[in-house]
C-alpha cells in the first residue's frame, strides 16, 4: 500500500496583508514544535512537518494575523486543504485570527 502525497503550501500574513512567510509540507523532515502539537492532540504518528507549522515557524516572532493553506493533487487541481487537528491546535496557540484554505 502506498501513501498518497499532496503538494501543500501555507502562507502567513500580518494584519495589513503583508506576506511574512511561505512553506511547504515535508514528508522527510520534522521539528520539535510539530512533535509537541501532534502529541498534544494525540496524533504522535503524524510527525512529518506540516506546511502550516513550517510557515508559522518561518514567520518567527512576527505577528501572524492570517494563514492561507493550499493543497493540490498530482494533476494540479486544487483540493480541500482544511488544516488538520494538529495544525488547528498550533494556529490557535499562536493566536492566528483568520484561516483560509482551498476547497
Regions found by a protein language model. Give the residues of each.
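Zinc-dependent deaminase catalytic domain
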Residues: 1-103
Amino acid at each position: 500500500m502506498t501513501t498518497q502525497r499532496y503538494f501543500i503550501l501555507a502562507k502567513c500574513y500580518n494584519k495589513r496583508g503583508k506576506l511574512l512567510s511561505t512553506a511547504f509540507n515535508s514528508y522527510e523532515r520534522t521539528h520539535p514544535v510539530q512533535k509537541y502539537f501532534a502529541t498534544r492532540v494525540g496524533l504522535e504518528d503524524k510527525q512529518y512537518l506540516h506546511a502550516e507549522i513550517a510557515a508559522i515557524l518561518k514567520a518567527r516572532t512576527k505577528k501572524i494575523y492570517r494563514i492561507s493553506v493550499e493543497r493540490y493533487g498530482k494533476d494540479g487541481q486544487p483540493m480541500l486543504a482544511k488544516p488538520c487537528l494538529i495544525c488547528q491546535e498550533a494556529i490557535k496557540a499562536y493566536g492566528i485570527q483568520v484561516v483560509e484554505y482551498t476547497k
